Amino acid sequence: MKRAHFATLQPRCVVCHEAPLAITSAIRERDDDILEGILGCTNDKCQREYPIVDGIPILVAAIRGWLNANALQILKRDDLSPEIESLIGDALGANSSFDTLRQHVGIYTYDHYESKESAVLALLDAALSLAGDVPGGAAVDIGCSVGRTTFDIAARFAQLTVGVDLNFAMLRVASHALREGRVSYARRRVGLAYDRSDIEVDLPARELVDFWCCDAGLLPFRDATFAVASMLNVIDCVAAPRDTLAECSRVLRDGGNVLIATPYDWAPTATPVEQWLGGHSQRSALRGASEPALQALLREMKFEIVAERDQLPWRLRLHDRSAVDYSVHVIAARRT
């Protein structure tokens, strides 16, 4: 965690929602960067502690439950040889937590850093072109995944930018790219066969970027902190889209811009059906359509839609012989 980002953003406790956080322990540092440490709530009646691991502060309210559910992500080694990692993967088998994790990380890392035609960067460019001129100020990349878009946003606006996500394994890739200028991941060839990809990455505006582990529906930032927020392929991946948009509205200043992209690929494993924006109740006036549901919710959350485009392609590589194609709705909106 960069001290400069912490000092500028002045995060608050996500449990008591009142007190600012303080750096109570810096266990391992490099220059102005805390790689391991502890943040603490300054409210005497709360005193919640939050760990910093691999340079990433974990600012989650239900920290005990989150750590228990994500222990593999936190404790997973990255120093095993490809041969031993392959043997372990074969032994654990398909659909194991280990294999699911490396599949997901590999899918997004390839698109963000190794693909010559990055779909997510194309979506970001499209969203930025729709937004037009935006006010100066800090930016937040909500649902940043492995982080490539966060660097481009920082470079575009030349402002402090923080990428937030709840997936620690993805954030670890982003943090390593930020701090070491390298990306190393298992790229799936077919089945349980993976090839280790270790590449040097030349990233813009690294000095302006940091990555934090946060719940998009309960952000640790003060009201009106940011001038720009991006939410690329996030709305249909969170437990409560309404809460996520409400938090985005809260942390954006008046006149701030939000960039949204979504294929409305609703799945009950990520979002309870009751929380979907459209995608059900086709007997209603909207006939189950998601687009007008999102547009109406944005207006409810004090956003004015500036421009939008539909049917933009987003392709994700699954393995050498398989990919999934989405058709994405992109919206640029301004907080009023």
Task: For the regions a language model picked out, list residue spans one by one.
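A short glycine-rich, Lys/Arg-flanked "PGG" loop and its adjoining helix->strand segment in the class I
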Residues: 242-254
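Conserved SAM-binding loop of SAM-dependent methyltransferases across substrates and taxa
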Residues: 146-157
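A short acidic, Gly/Pro-enriched loop at the edge of an enzyme's catalytic core
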Residues: 214-229
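Conserved class I S-adenosyl-L-methionine
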Residues: 135-145, 162, 259-288
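Conserved SAM/SAH-binding beta-strand->alpha-helix loop
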Residues: 167
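Conserved alpha-helix/loop element of class I SAM-dependent methyltransferases that forms part
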Residues: 104-136
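S-adenosyl-L-methionine
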Residues: 179-215
